[in-house]
Amino acid sequence: MAENVPADVNTLSFELAIEELETIVKRLEDGKVALEESVAIYERGEALKRRCEELLRRAEARVEKITTDASGHVTGTEPLDVR
């Protein structure tokens, strides 16, 4: 893949997506990017943010709390309620 062609957001791991998002935030905060490019990277940043949120939701759904009996023996699992 060419360096100037960004990867499809939907194929990125959480770690790669968050790393790219952090880079975009830094570039926008520096204020040295032309208007059109700023808009384009902002839009990519929004897509990356959505990707990260989706991956976090999926991970949260997979996290389970281990249940134990009175003596501390594992009896099973149940969905973790983080609310």
Curated annotation (Swiss-Prot):
Catalytic activities: Exonucleolytic cleavage in either 5'- to 3'- or 3'- to 5'-direction to yield nucleoside 5'-phosphates
GO cellular component, as recorded: cytosol; exodeoxyribonuclease VII complex
> What InterPro entries has UniProt attached to this entry?
Exonuc_VII_S, Exonuc_VII_ssu_sf
| Biological process annotations from GO | DNA catabolic process
**Which gene name does the record give?**
xseB
Q: Which family does it belong to?
A: Belongs to the XseB family.
Q: Which NCBIfam families match?
A: PRK00977.1-3, xseB
What name does UniProt use for this protein? Exodeoxyribonuclease 7 small subunit
